[in-house]
């Protein structure tokens, strides 16, 4: 979810409605506590009564980015979710009355994970960037109040996917692992929704090395008992140059499906 066009992350904006929460988050992330938005173009976190949001300052800045089960396109997608409408669900092998254990190893804002949970899957979300993990944690906290049944099927882990998958015991291995890595080099910015561009512009975090996509795909296949599903732009090369066992095309993206090896 991170690219080279970074913008500075200035800190956490204190809010009269949530001053203690803003201060606690700033302390945990080791970021400055702001009393007003940055004057120059930059990113900042804002903790208000509406939840935690990643915001941008400057002209033509997109609106706040937060994790929500009710707002905008995501809310509409969840309300309309069905096995027939969601190509991702079919790629994962979801069927009516069947509850799968799925790991979303590149969770991002958790939008696909929420849809899978709405369709009955139990989903573990793995996110390694502390800022994105904080957005997810806040969204799931609010979801436990507004959508308790759905939220109960979502479990967030702030960790590096390679390390987390490597430590799974045989009994803990999921049926399905989903990967949605950053769009490959050469993809146009137009391929990325405007409300997600700020997320892609987050600066690198200390201690986080670039994702080794070859190792991640190999370990995901070794850890999944049924399949690995990789979300790709429609015309992009397969992840790590590894041809999938089969594909399911969508409008602008496709799902490359690899047979899991842990069930052999």
Swiss-Prot record:
Sequence positions that bind S-adenosyl-L-methionine: 111-112, 127-128, 180
Reactions performed catalytically: guanosine(1516) in 16S rRNA + S-adenosyl-L-methionine = N(2)-methylguanosine(1516) in 16S rRNA + S-adenosyl-L-homocysteine + H(+)
Annotated compartments: Cytoplasm
Top-rank EC class of the record's enzyme: transferase
EC number(s) reported in the record: 2.1.1.242
Keyword field contains Metal-binding: no
Nucleotide-binding as UniProt keyword: no
InterPro entries reported for this sequence: 16SrRNA_methylTrfase_J, SAM-dependent_MTases_sf
A GO molecular function held by the record: rRNA (guanine-N2-)-methyltransferase activity
Similarity comment: family membership: Belongs to the methyltransferase superfamily. RsmJ family.
Function: Specifically methylates the guanosine in position 1516 of 16S rRNA.
HAMAP family hit by this protein: 16SrRNA_methyltr_J
Protein name: Ribosomal RNA small subunit methyltransferase J
Species assigned in the record: Alkalilimnicola ehrlichii (strain ATCC BAA-1101 / DSM 17681 / MLHE-1)
Lineage: Bacteria, Pseudomonadati, Pseudomonadota, Gammaproteobacteria, Chromatiales
């Amino acid at each position: 979810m991170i690219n080279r066009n970074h913008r500075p992350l200035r800190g956490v904006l204190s809010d009269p409605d949530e001053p203690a929460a803003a201060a606690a988050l700033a302390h945990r992330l080791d970021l400055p506590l702001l009393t007003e938005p940055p004057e120059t173009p930059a990113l900042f976190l804002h903790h208000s009564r509406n939840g935690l949001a990643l915001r941008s300052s400057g002209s033509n800045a997109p609106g706040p980015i937060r994790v929500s089960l009710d707002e905008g396109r995501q809310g509409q997608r969840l309300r309309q979710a069905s096995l027939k409408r969601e190509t991702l669900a079919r790629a994962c092998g979801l069927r009516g009355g069947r509850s799968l254990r799925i790991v979303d190893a590149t969770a991002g804002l958790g939008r696909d994970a929420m849809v899978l949970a709405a369709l009955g899957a139990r989903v573990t979300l793995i996110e390694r960037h502390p800022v994105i993990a904080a957005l997810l944690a806040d969204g799931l906290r609010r979801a436990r109040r507004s959508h308790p049944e759905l939220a109960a099927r979502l479990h967030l882990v702030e960790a590096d996917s390679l390390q987390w998958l490597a430590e799974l015991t045989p009994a803990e291995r999921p049926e399905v692992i989903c990967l949605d890595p950053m769009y490959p080099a050469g993809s146009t910015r137009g391929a990325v929704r405007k409300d997600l561009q700020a997320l892609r512009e987050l600066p690198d975090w200390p201690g986080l090395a670039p994702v080794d996509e070859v190792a991640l795909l190999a370990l995901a296949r070794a850890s999944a008992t049924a399949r690995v599903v990789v979300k790709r732009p429609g015309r992009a090369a397969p992840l790590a140059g590894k041809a999938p066992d089969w594909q399911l095309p969508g409008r602008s993206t496709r799902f490359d499906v690899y047979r899991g090896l842990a069930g052999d």
